[in-house]
Amino acid sequence: MDNNKKIHFIKMHGLGNDYIFVDTEFNTIPDPAKASIEWSKPHTGIGSDGLILIGRSPEADFTMRIINADGLEGQMCGNASRCVGKYVYESGLTTKKSLSLLTRAGMKQLELDVDDNGKVKTVCVDLMEPVLEDHRNSRPVANPCLRVCLCQ
């Protein structure tokens, strides 16, 4: 990785998950796994839970790839997806308040609540029902749909 190359990024957090967000339309990262490992280190890097790559797709308004701090690619993070919604709107990459986001876990719908000054107040995302590998401590719930909103 070229240590002299400038990469434009923003670090954001959602309910304790902090990530480094990079728009791949304007930045190329040849080895995202290596970058995530290096940049996520708290003392010698930027410090984060991982790297989020924001891209474009013909199937969705935006795409999101999650590269965890260990270099492995994740499927979905609700907190990161809400940060993507806030970032793309407040950066002027979209004027839509209802966005589609393609992830490894499938298509997600983001709903943004924006104030009169153009600042995103909340971002809601519908998440899939979690898949638990250990069902011993699970409990049935009335409504399996999970909706997460970012509130200030």
Describe these PLM feature segments.
Residues 139, 144-152:
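Cationic, amphipathic, low-complexity alpha-helical segments enriched
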